[in-house]
Regions:
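Conserved, mostly hydrophobic/aromatic
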Residues: 24, 66, 93, 122, ...
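Active-site environment of divalent metal-dependent phosphoester hydrolases
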Residues: 26-31, 81-84, 112-115, 137, ...
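Active-site mouth loops of central-metabolism enzymes
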Residues: 45-56, 78, 104-113, 138-141
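Short, acidic/polar
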Residues: 56-66, 88, 111-122, 145
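Mid-to-C-terminal alpha-helical segments outside catalytic/metal-binding sites
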Residues: 1-23, 30-73, 241-244, 255-292
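Catalytic pocket-lining loop regions of alpha/beta-barrel enzymes
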Residues: 3-4, 128-129, 139-246
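Short, well-structured secondary-structure segments
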Residues: 63-66, 70-85, 92-110, 131
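A cross-domain feature marking catalytic cores of carbohydrate-active enzymes
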Residues: 25, 78, 107-111, 132-134, ...
Length: 292
């Protein structure tokens, strides 16, 4: 996959940037990574379509590929799919951070009685980003067990990448309403809405417009693979939200070259300043530079 490198570097070099900040990448323990690949390979009910994953190299090879492409900061974004696994995932992610210092120290949680305790410790230790995935984990964002967690994260200002939308296949736990209820109680939560909230693009856009710390990530939206064209009438609002849109890709679990996500953003024709903000400046503002 080293042939992907020139196209990616050409993109950010043409914008005069020093690289990219990608806020939505995944690195998981090998056994769980294999299980995730198997779910996508089976194109089961939570995937809903063929999804040929392009990047299946080892952890070390994928890290080196991101580095070669010029991705300066990237997370692991583990996500707990059931009670009792968050601590295992978080311990593995902490080890990854030690081995890959430019990565964003990531962690996850699940609605369980001990969640507030381990989140409090992780925040104190300096975790840089959390991830939850309600479509996979099948839980409600406004579960009372998460109330103390949201309070801790709102006070800390730590970003949380939240897969709250119904893409690729919705269920009883997805959609904008639970996120809106959480934000009504914790309005300064630093939520990064994965996939721009697709398919509920308008509703999640409105949450970003009306809440100071809510941002959107671009993951897979705008690409040719994505089944839902982004409404043209919403593009001016994305320009207004230039400071709140963050580059995300879902690497390695994508069925096209990494550069295609970047090309899909460029062809929106929202201007080079918008691209610079999305692909670098916003991520640096939220997460800082490596070693800073």
């Amino acid at each position: 996959m080293t042939d992907d490198v020139p196209d990616v570097r050409r993109f950010w070099e043409s914008l005069g940037l020093p690289g990219l900040v990608d806020v939505h990448t995944h690195f998981l323990p090998p056994s769980i990574q294999r299980a995730v690949y198997a779910v996508f390979d089976a194109a089961g009910p939570k995937i809903g379509r063929e999804w040929p994953i392009r990047y299946r190299q080892s952890v070390d090879e994928r890290v080196e590929l991101l580095r070669a492409m010029g991705v300066r900061r990237f997370p692991t974004l583990p996500y707990a799919h059931k009670p009792g696994v968050a601590t295992y995932l978080n311990d593995w992610a902490a080890g990854f951070k030690r081995d890959v210092p430019e990565s964003l120290w990531s962690a996850t949680f699940y609605p369980e009685p001990e969640a507030a305790s381990y989140i409090e410790g992780l925040v104190a230790d300096g975790v840089e980003v959390f991830k939850v995935h309600v479509q996979v984990g099948e839980f409600h964002l406004d579960d009372p067990l998460l109330d103390p967690v949201w309070g801790l994260l709102e006070d800390a200002g730590t970003p949380i990448v939240i897969h709250a939308g119904g893409a690729p296949v919705g269920n009883d736990f997805t959609g904008p309403a639970p996120m809106a209820r959480v934000l009504a109680r914790f309005p300064r939560l630093a939520a990064v809405i994965a996939h721009m909230g697709a398919p509920d693009l308008v509703e999640f856009l409105e949450l970003a417009e009306t809440h100071e710390r809510v941002c959107l990530d671009t993951t897979m939206v705008f690409t040719d693979f994505w089944p839902q064209p982004y409404p043209v009438e919403l593009l001016p609002r994305l320009v207004d939200l230039q400071h709140k849109v963050l580059l995300g890709t879902d690497f390695p679990t994508i069925p096209y070259p990494y550069a295609h996500q970047l090309e899909s953003l460029a062809r929106l024709d929202l201007g080079d300043d918008w691209l610079r903000a999305v692909c670098w400046h916003n991520g640096v503002r939220v997460f800082g530079l490596p070693g800073a």
